[in-house]
């Protein structure tokens, strides 16, 4: 007779473990911050490229130095352990430094979609009671309005040109002149960094309960919610991908086309590849028509995107008859993909010498992770 006392549930039996490498079963979690995990994993690779932004390359040594400078600048601006800094931006090197710098000093980033209205941004600032706001210059006016009647004391302004190679930066500023009228509490990013030159870069002691970021759900089951994710969320994800060592190897390239304000974009598009020693090519605002050209230029082994990215790839005439055997793991999430569209993409990949089909992830912001199913 079967009773509840002698039933072995799947969660206890864990039959899926037979497919796992024994070396990774019950592997202990890294007891360190997300920043320290990246640093430890690349301590012997400091001269290798960590980030690439429109042709400008930043080594892992550059990444560490710039993160520490940003941490010092936060301290000089009055940021303390437990504070939440709101960031309204697309993905840029500065946003990446800000994430790891805030994590280093025990603060938290609240990442907000720059397409939101002033009222929407205001709501997210109020939700976490930010005193410091970081925003792109192209959305400054909206953020200035959003910061009214909040506790925001200082606004740090980024330009997409801040990390561009000099010729591109000059060209960008000529074609996109900054016509904002800045309030007295606004400070440009480079001056913000300069203000921190005498402040401490030391990290706070590791706290396993510290939330390094607030991201927002997609609102699938109701209004979008702010979700606090810890260092453990990010490090666990990176460690899981490290177990997939047949596909992910140090020195490979991941092309980041996802925004920072969703867990998928930051966990899979930034922290995971950096923790695994990959180069992250930052594409802050992807033009779908240029996807094929970008793939041929950078030859990224890895990419995390949404289904429409891969449908665009399969239809791109620039990729016709091209050898794409460099592709190792292209994954789709964030939206549904029909059976027909998936077949079209997989047929395209197979016809272009790609060994593996499209990986589909079924994710959940609250756990900063996803499941994938193979038939």
Task: For each feature predicted by the language model, list its residue ranges.
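Conserved AMP-binding A3 loop
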Residues: 59-61, 212-236
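Conserved AMP-binding/adenylate-forming
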Residues: 53-58, 70-116, 128, 137, ...
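Structural core segment of the AMP-binding/adenylate-forming
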Residues: 77, 104-191
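Gly/Ser/Thr-rich phosphate-binding loop
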Residues: 301-305, 314-375
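Conserved pre-ATP/AMP-binding loop-to-beta segment of ANL
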Residues: 180-216, 223, 246-253
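Conserved AMP-binding/adenylation subdomain of ANL enzymes
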Residues: 235-253, 261-302, 312, 316
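N-lobe entry segment of adenylate-forming
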Residues: 1-58, 62-77, 81, 149, ...
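Conserved structural elements of the adenylate-forming
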Residues: 64-69, 199, 208, 227-249, ...
């Amino acid at each position: 007779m079967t009773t509840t006392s002698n039933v072995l549930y799947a969660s206890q039996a864990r039959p899926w473990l037979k497919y796992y490498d024994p070396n990774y079963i019950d592997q202990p979690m890294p007891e360190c911050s997300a920043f320290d995990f990246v640093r430890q994993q690349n301590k012997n690779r400091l001269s290798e490229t960590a980030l690439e932004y429109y042709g400008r390359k930043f080594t892992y040594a550059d990444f560490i130095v710039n993160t520490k400078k940003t941490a010092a600048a936060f301290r000089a601006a009055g940021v303390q352990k437990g504070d939440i800094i709101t960031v309204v931006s697309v993905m840029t090197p500065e946003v990446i430094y800000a994430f790891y710098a805030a994590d280093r000093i025990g603060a938290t980033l609240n990442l907000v979609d720059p397409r939101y209205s002033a009222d929407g941004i205001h709501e997210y600032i109020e939700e976490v009671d930010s005193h410091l706001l970081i925003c792109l210059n192209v959305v400054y006016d909206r953020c200035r309005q959003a910061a009214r009647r909040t506790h925001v004391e200082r606004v740090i302004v980024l330009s997409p040109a801040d990390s561009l190679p000099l010729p591109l930066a000059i060209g960008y500023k000529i074609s996109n002149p900054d016509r904002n009228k800045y309030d007295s509490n606004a400070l440009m990013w480079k001056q913000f960094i300069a203000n921190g030159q005498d402040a401490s870069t030391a990290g706070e002691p590791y706290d396993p309960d510290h939330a390094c970021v607030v991201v927002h759900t997609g609102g699938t089951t109701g209004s979008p919610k702010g979700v606090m994710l810890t260092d453990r969320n990010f490090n666990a994800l990176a460690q899981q991908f490290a177990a997939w060592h047949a596909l992910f190897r140090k020195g490979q390239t991941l092309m980041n086309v996802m925004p920072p304000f969703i867990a998928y974009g930051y966990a899979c598009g930034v922290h995971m590849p950096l923790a695994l020693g990959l180069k992250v090519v930052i594409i802050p605002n992807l033009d779908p028509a240029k996807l094929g050209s970008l793939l041929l230029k950078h030859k990224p082994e890895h990419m995390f995107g949404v289904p429409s990215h891969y449908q665009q790839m399969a239809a791109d005439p620039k990729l016709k008859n091209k050898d794409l055997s460099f592709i190792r793991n292209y994954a789709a999430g964030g939206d549904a993909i029909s059976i027909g569209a998936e077949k079209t993409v997989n047929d395209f990949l197979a016809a272009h010498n790609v060994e593996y089909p499209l990986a589909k992830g079924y994710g959940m912001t609250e756990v900063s992770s996803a499941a994938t199913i193979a038939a």
